[in-house]
């Protein structure tokens, strides 16, 4: 690549970043639009939505060397996907190689060496287990800075008809726009789910006069493993260690090189998405 081409490439990346960080509507967390299937949150839940602007940010994590998981709505209809920032402040181009609309999942191929995170066997996960959400919340306000929050698994998600949705669980770690697609980490450092949705707190408050705080939902690790089957990133479930109790700063350090922001320049907004 000659000097002119390098200059153009740098300019293009900077242009995307400016679109992302200067946009007044850069909100990437939960679409209110979702198909009414057993795999998709009902209208009472917000599914962390892509912005109508030309660029947006979510979170992703490596599950194999060169392969990253994120939420599909983070990257759908994108003409350019970048992963970063790396230690040397670079952004690496990524490509979608598999998607699942119903489960809101996307597998990305990235020319990047990064340690993968292990996916825990969901059958080992007890209700009440401590959990850590790691991602890039509120990028328009806080800049693209990685954050960690702590909570517990509150239980399985119950849909409006009071049936148990076996694919999602409720957790209390604070989750904001930009966390979408990020991992939920157990105290032993393994992934037990992916951040995908949260309760529409303002909508619920208008109906109940009660403001629910930190009611969020994640797709279980068992669904992530099923999605990766028959792909280059296929993996098996690891046994969860309930005796291992890493502290938050240790969790963040352990996963530091595996979790990145996913920057997506949109080709066109999703129809019906706010």
Task: Name each model feature, range by range.
Residues 57, 64-143, 165-168, 230-242:
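Conserved active-site neighborhood of the chymotrypsin/trypsin-like protease fold
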Residues 35-48, 116, 137-141, 191, ...:
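C-terminal cap/linker of serine protease catalytic domains
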Residues 30-34:
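Sec/Tat signal peptide C-region and signal peptidase I cleavage site
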Residues 117-167, 175-179, 195-206:
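Flexible, gly/ser-rich surface segments that form the specificity/activation loops bordering the active-site cleft
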Residues 16-29:
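Bacterial N-terminal signal peptides
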Residues 65, 97-99, 156, 187, ...:
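Residue-level recognition of beta-strand microenvironments
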Residues 47-71, 90-93, 115-118, 181, ...:
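A conserved glycine-rich beta-strand in the N-terminal activation segment of trypsin-fold
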